[in-house]
Amino acid sequence: MRKKIIYYVSLFTTIVLLSLSLFSNFTYSPFNADNVKKSIAILSSDTYAGRLAGSKENSLLEELIRKNFQDNKLIPLNDSYKESFKVISPVNNNSTPYLKISYDDGYEENLKYGVDFKEDMINFKNTKITFSNEDKVNVFSNYIEVSTTNGKFLFHLAPNNNFSFRSSFIHDFPYNMMVLINTDTYNKILNSLRDGAEISINIPFSTEEKEISNVVGVIKGTSKSLPPLVLTAHFDHLGTDALKNIYGGALDNASGTSFMLELQKSLATYGKPKRDIIFVALNAEEFGL
C-alpha cells in the first residue's frame, strides 16, 4: 500500500510539473495598449529632453531600447544590437543670443530673443553674422534673404508670430542659418537697412560631430528562404532650445516607438514565426536621414 501511495504521489507530481512546463511554453503576452500610453508618456517626458540625436538623453534611449530587445530575447542582426554612425548635430554653445541694429549716430537697438527673433533649427553653418545694405538683400512678403561673403542667410516670419515651432536639422541645407522673426522685427530690419544701419545677430548654437546608433533586434523565423518582415520607428526628436523649451514629440515619434516596443514584446512570446521579424529603432530622422 505504501508503495502505491508513493507511486501515485510521484505520478501526480510529474503530471503537475509537466503541465506547468507546457503552460510556460505556450503562454503569451497580449498586446497592451495601456503599456503603449505609459511608454509614450515616458519617452516624451522631460527626462529625455526631446531626444535630439547626439544628445546624452538620446544615448540613454538607445540603451533603453537595446535592453528592451535583449530582455525580450530578440537577437542582434549582426554582432551588436546597435548600428553606429556619425552625424553633425546642433549643440547649445551657451553664448548670449542677440539681434542688434546699430545706426550711424551711435544709437543701438537690441531686440529680445524668444520674443522678436529666435533660431530656426534647420542649420547652423554660421551662427554669427553682420550685414548692411551693402550686402545683397532680397525682400519677399514673408522672408528676407541675405547674402554675404560668409554665405546665405534667411530671416522668415514665424507663423502667427509664434516661436514654438522648431524645424528639423538639415546640415547640408542651402542656407547657412535660418532665423524666425515676428512682423515687427521684419519691418525693423527693412527700415533700418534703408537708413544705412548695420545688423548683427548671434544664435547660441553650433555644430559638432557625434556618434549615434540605430538599434536593431530580430525574432528569428523557421524559414531561411522567406524574406524578413521589417518594422521600423524613429525615436529621435528636436531636443531643447536655448530658452529651455523641451520638444517632447509625443506624436513624432514617441508613439510609433512605443507601439513597436510593445509589439516586439508581445510577438516574442508567440513562438517562432515562419520568417524573421526585424525591429529597427531609427535615429536621426529629424536630421533628414
Regions found by a protein language model. Give the residues of each.
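N-terminal hydrophobic or amphipathic helices/low-complexity stretches enriched
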Residues: 4-76, 165, 219-221
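Noncatalytic luminal/extracellular "stalk/propeptide" segments of secretory-pathway proteins
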Residues: 49-144
